[in-house]
Swiss-Prot record:
Protein's UniProt name: Glutamine--tRNA ligase
Species of origin: Photobacterium profundum (strain SS9)
NCBIfam families, per database record: glnS, PRK14703.1
Alphabetized GO MF terms: ATP binding; glutamine-tRNA ligase activity
Gene: glnS
Family that this chain belongs to: Belongs to the class-I aminoacyl-tRNA synthetase family.
Amino acid sequence: MMSESEARPTNFIRQIIDADLDSGKHKSVHTRFPPEPNGYLHIGHAKSICLNFGIAQDYQGQCNLRFDDTNPEKEDIEYVESIKNDVNWLGFDWSGEICYSSNYFDKLYGFAVELINKGLAYVDELSPEQMREYRGNLTEPGKPSPYRDRSVAENLELFEKMKNGEVEEGIMSLRAKIDMASSFMVLRDPVIYRVRFATHHQTGDKWCIYPMYDFTHCISDALEGITHSICTLEFQDNRRLYDWVLDNITIDCQPRQYEFSRLNLEYTVMSKRKLNQLVTDNLVSGWDDPRMPTVSGLRRRGFTSASIREFCKRIGVTKQENTIEMSSLESCIRDDLNENAPRAMAVLDPVKIVIENFTGDTEVLTVSNHPNNSEMGTREVPFTREIWIEREDFREEANKKYKRLVLGKEVRLRGAYVIKAERIEKDAEGNITTIFCSYDNETLGVNPSDGRKVKGVIHWVSADAGLPAEIRLYDRLFTVANPAAADDFVTVINPESLTVLNGFVEPSLKVAEAEKAFQFERIGYFCVDSKDSSAEKLVFNRTVGLRDTWAKMGE
């Protein structure tokens, strides 16, 4: 049995936390997961969820779920609910009530007034284009706005007008007065408030000025008593603004921000803007399309929460930016389902077999649900005179390497008997329509008594009792490993990312619940689609194949 220290992952953030606790800097750990509710969570967010909530669990601390909801035009209660569901599904609970940055709008306004009174914020009337021009660039310092030296009284009056709805959008903004010559662009008098006449999903029409993320985030952390504010590397420079705000307002708590590398995954995109475009342009069926990297999309495809947590554990937490191969994610779900998914049989491209010497009624066979786990029990599988097999599992002629059914030769049916292909029937186009076979009724669970060798084993489904099913084969959404690098990422969408087949599954699957996973023997891992499947129309999604196919795709 692993000790607690062996069971815990280790990384540089946990080392910082250990040092803070050992030194007495903090008596306990308080983290947070602060998504903006402007889209569905993706697997990159799952990494942050596992990190922040995992730290709170391991250190017996707290982790808040906080919605950084300062942009009402792009946010929606639909996204709030989906995020809550995703966090719970991944196996985590937040501490106390859900937090919203909008809960702090009154206090944030007060802190903005404090900065004005200290001469550290001013109301600017530069247009966005002028502001960009005045800001300079990485090689040239910015120049001060002509409104930078307004008096405190004038700034207070104008900011009050902004709050009261007396100023149109885009005419005025409140900027922090820091350093227009700073080598860090984020410190060149950033905007901290702007006018927006938009209804907010939490506060309604109470406010028409909204704080910017960089101003809101650090103050929300402080108000909630966050000890370790963990975010991705793109916010590394923003830490200077994070610290500046907290250093210049009257607030008790002074959290520290720490950055780690975000998750980049091959053959997909993580940008919410790009993901939203895929949805709004109907290039996918929705945020939960099984080809999407969203948590809901992965869940619908058949990924388990345990497999995603294991993936996040395997890739670790570092400051090194890298791109993870899709095979790494798929290996986690393959390992999970290989151990935990019951087996079943399905035929995706059926051709009929007639067993001519089978003359009795339906024979009910007892088949194991898992070859290595007897506790999963058994199921009843009907064996009938007519069955379906995969079209690719039969050839009229084949070499010795082909271990399936060949005309004039034998093969074993999984969990059933040995059959021999005697003759075939074709249609006018030359396609095989029926394979006529004989069976050895003394080979159920045993080898032929005369010692003849039958090497191949194929799966099958009763033609009389099998259930028609729609089988959705999902592939990578893009044809290139880094679609974000394309001039237009839409042009590299994989036109073959979804193939829909109509096949047959064994009758035991009729009562399978939504999201239930199975290994379709010899094919791959599939799950019951959570939206479209019903008792009248079964729909299964391929989660992953039995073997890694990504190495071949990369060649």
